[in-house]
């Protein structure tokens, strides 16, 4: 069993990761992957030559390291009994939120994809597809959506 969970920078993520570890233990999952989706716009560097290519690569590496450290801090602060003996890793992916993690779950043949519930949106924001809409438009695997009552 392979469980993939979104670990995006959100107030809901800590609880989602905690639940992902609990579910992984319940299913005796052999693997848990915490995926940080990084928007391509954060690396918005036009590559015209070797110098700008190097700049874009360094920026991606820095963002990947920052996200990995953030997620590792969340896991370190979980009680040891929740972590159990689950083998987990982090994976940074660049692209459109929702679509990227859905595609990743499909490629790695995840048995379960765990996502945060939607953030509250204004009327204008509802006109544009959000991460869950991308996932639900083409469901790559079983999906569990965690709704955290404290944060929405």
What spans do the regions from the language model cover?
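Charged docking surfaces used in two-component/phosphorelay signaling
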Residues: 92-100
